[in-house]
Amino acid sequence: MEYITNYTLGELKERFKGLGLEPYRAKQVFRWIYKKFITDFARMTDLSKEHRKLLSENFQFHPLEKLDRVEAPDAIKYLFKTIDNHIVETVLIKERDHYTLCVSSQIGCAVGCTFCATALDGLKRNLTTAEIIDQYIQVQQDLGEEKIRNVVFMGMGEPLANYENVKKAVEIMISSEGLDLSKRRITISTSGIISQLKRMAQDEVMREVNLAVSLNAVSQKAREELMPLTKTNTLKELMEVLKSFPLPKYRRITLEYVLIKGVNDSVKDAEKLAKLIGKHKKRFKVNLIPFNPDPNLPYERPSLTDIMKFQKVLWKHGISNFVRFSKGIEVFGACGQLRAKRLKLEIEGAVK
């Protein structure tokens, strides 16, 4: 049986035609799912009993099963299980006056960043569109009256390596009949796959959302050590692509920079980062992210003094920047950490 949340509105209209249903019925169903977050055909009361029966015989809703919900003052971490028994992480970030949802796009990751817990287990597979959307639906159902305002593709996986499914999820998110999110409220974070960035630049849907690029180093050699994909996606070519990437008015590309003690956090590194950006200050803003400590990774967080020194250099050069301390440290909030803990406990339990 198919998952109905795998379909964009246009696709669902075509699918409904094949079932003998009028295309406008797809809009009705979309509104129930994405406006009221009803995931039970029996409750869709503007459909006839016959139509509800037909839909329930052909479609189902939740490809994810909620395993765990761990709450801290500034974030809620959800663990979901797929039908093939993989674990997916989702984080709901509590901002001052709204919520931001951090969704995963893959199970594991093939990029292999040495500072990321998700990379420890390698890539298992891409998430389907339904699995991406179901993260949103189940968290919103859990929230009730309060609404998710922003979505960031910054969870497990490389979104641009799962391009088609991520794009379909974005289409559902921005559809006026779907989640109806502003494109400005959606951010895709990528490690910098150059071929996919070029594809994104030509894509009328994808190029309109916010773009964040995980930079993390200011030289080819240093970036290769932290992010092995840099060997085939060079820093030089990446910056060239970003400097010509088509941007909506008043929008900037975010350069994400994970600050790691003794690795990339020196004043000299900050000066090199400023030089890398050069005259394109109005095109970029820098998101400084102090490393979130993990017992499985050989890195440490810089001191607050060193973080401030790094930031001061960027301000000196007129580069817009901010420091983002990881939300949800109490609940293993960084990418892949709670999943890794859960897998470790399951393995230990099996051994016992």
Residue ranges and their predicted role:
Residues 1-88, 94, 243-251, 257-352:
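Auxiliary Fe-S-binding modules of radical SAM enzymes
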Residues 69-70, 104-105, 189, 214:
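Short linear Ser/Thr-Pro motifs
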Residues 76, 88, 99-103, 111, ...:
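Generic beta-strand structural signal
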Residues 92-93, 165:
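Residue-level structural signal for beta-strand termini and adjacent loop
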Residues 94-134:
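Canonical Radical SAM [4Fe-4S] cluster-binding loop centered on the CxxxCxxC motif
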Residues 130, 134-144:
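Ferredoxin-type iron-sulfur electron-transfer modules in oxidoreductases and energy-metabolism complexes
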Residues 140-150, 155-317, 322:
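Conserved AdoMet/S-adenosylmethionine-binding subsite of the radical SAM
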